[in-house]
Design a protein with these regions (language model features):
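Phosphate/nucleotide-binding beta-alpha loop and adjacent structural elements of enzyme active sites
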Residues: 1-264
Length: 264
């Protein structure tokens, strides 16, 4: 049954973007080391504030609802932020909320082609954070699977089509497609030598995720994680990941998902 109030709430960002942003990103306002975990926010956001110069060029691959875009909009020049979000609904919303930031309705992969983006739905909740170019097998917990056609492009091809003189940082959150992206980004990595922050979660990989991390290390990187008390980088080892208990996978104070790769 059509619910006009639900429809109005979903499209409120068109009526008043400023008010909508203040509500959507409320937990990011006045974010500190003292409240970041109780607000269930990725602590790497605070770290980025400390290490990125204002002129840094930042790629947000898998922008989602825009947490990183919102936070970095106050730190970097907005014209130096490039955000990729292939989900049509999220892309449309982000373009309206952040008119000065560069958004691309593209998926980054190892091929330039038309692809299918899928994400599960439970009842009426769309699980955008699980959107993937991989085929999703229907599970009992999912009400249905939503799919849409999207354009995939190699990062090398995209970079070659732009006039970008520097590239400092690439944040990657693309649900198991990390290596596909990097396989299409060899020229970019070798030329710009950007720092990478890659969200790698075991539930989206058949192989042990250290195998994924090792392949990225072979591109000339060292792997690190953000220490939860020191808020500085520490070397990442297989033992650290092995000691993690998946029961805490949604607790950013106890579980490491964002792996930070520094170019050698």
């Amino acid at each position: 049954m059509f619910n006009p109030y639900y429809s109005l709430a979903q499209n409120f960002y068109f009526i008043s973007p400023t008010i909508y942003k203040s509500r959507l990103y409320k937990k990011l306002i006045q974010l500190t080391k003292d409240n970041v975990f109780e607000r269930n926010v990725e602590p790497e956001l605070l770290w980025l504030k400390d290490i990125l110069p204002q002129k840094a060029v930042f790629l947000d691959v898998g922008a989602g609802i825009g947490n990183y875009v919102y936070y970095l909009d106050y730190i970097l020049f907005p014209e130096n932020i490039y955000a990729f979000e292939p989900n049509k609904k999220l892309y449309k919303k982000l373009k309206k909320l952040f008119p000065k930031i560069n958004f691309e309705p593209l998926a980054l992969s190892d091929k330039t082609e038309t692809s299918t983006l899928s994400f599960p739905i439970i009842d009426t909740e769309e699980l955008f954070e699980k959107a993937t170019l991989k085929e999703i097998s229907p599970e009992n917990e999912y009400t249905k699977i939503y799919s849409q056609k999207t354009q995939s492009i190699r990062l090398d091809d995209w970079i070659n089509s732009k006039e970008i003189s520097r590239l400092d940082f690439i944040k990657i959150d693309i649900v198991g497609q990390e290596l596909n992206l990097l396989n299409g980004a060899n020229e970019t990595i070798n030329h710009y030598k950007p720092t990478l922050m890659v969200k790698i979660e075991q539930e989206f990989h058949q192989e042990n995720i250290w195998e994924v991390i090792s392949k990225i290390i072979k591109l000339g990187y060292t792997a690190h994680y953000l220490h939860r008390e020191k808020f500085g980088l520490e070397p990442l080892t297989p033992e650290i990941l092995t000691q993690q208990n998946t029961i805490f996978a949604k607790d950013d104070s106890r579980y490491i998902k964002n792996i930070i790769f520094i170019k050698n």
